[in-house]
């Protein structure tokens, strides 16, 4: 299975076998991610982090992943301090950064920017999130979390919150379809899963249900994947105010849940998960954030060819 010099742009570029290989690699590297073992797999390698959108977990976990493997991370810093503010286009930026680093991690607000960057890069490009469409490394870590805390095959999962603009759930739908998941989409009518995604899933014979009620489905699912309503994706602030607090996971709601239910969230959260949930055995979102480190370690090591 060849991963060396491969770009990581969309989950649709990966087969189930390839996804499983990434997850297996992450599991082998997890002791290094936890600081229990040391590794020099990326000794002498430089990873450039080009983030044109705010990020905490994705950026820091890529930095941690690079350093845990003995590599060095070059951080662009603020966009305001870069040549982009002088009018340099993304293609030229990518061409130049390719000369400085062995791999580029890109986060950008425009749909398709990572795919375009890969065309101009002379080193592997990993998509750290572009526009509202793709966020493959988040999906890999979501799959890894589900595999570690529950199971992937024939999973019963509900995705709730902002399903219209949420790139994490869009990527996750495709990936879980490879494992025969049964999916329930919970959202206000204004934030439903895009109809083309629902159609694609149904064509693959995936069972799909849509509702606006968490209470209706909480006892029937094994994983609940919550998302925040993203203020920055709303052109109209009034529309955001109408929907921001419609769905919330509380201790009372979880009384009706399966005892083995796991609650995931890509973070940051706002009001959609009450703090009281944090202390329950259902809460997996902080461990989920940690799992981003071994997953990104695996993707870095595979793309740079230091592990097979």
Swiss-Prot record:
Reactions that this protein is recorded to catalyse: carbamoyl phosphate + L-aspartate = N-carbamoyl-L-aspartate + phosphate + H(+)
GO biological process assignments: 'de novo' pyrimidine nucleobase biosynthetic process; 'de novo' UMP biosynthetic process; amino acid metabolic process
Keyword tags: Pyrimidine biosynthesis, Transferase
SUPFAM superfamilies: Aspartate/ornithine carbamoyltransferase (SSF53671)
Molecular function terms, GO-annotated: amino acid binding; aspartate carbamoyltransferase activity
Disulfide bonds: none
EC number: 2.1.3.2
Functional pathway: Pyrimidine metabolism; UMP biosynthesis via de novo pathway; (S)-dihydroorotate from bicarbonate: step 2/3
Domain of life according to the entry: Archaea
Residues reported to bind L-aspartate: 86, 167, 228
Similarity annotation: Belongs to the aspartate/ornithine carbamoyltransferase superfamily. ATCase family.
Task performed by this protein: Catalyzes the condensation of carbamoyl phosphate and aspartate to form carbamoyl aspartate and inorganic phosphate, the committed step in the de novo pyrimidine nucleotide biosynthesis pathway.
This protein's name: Aspartate carbamoyltransferase catalytic subunit
Source species of the chain: Methanosarcina acetivorans (strain ATCC 35395 / DSM 2834 / JCM 12185 / C2A)
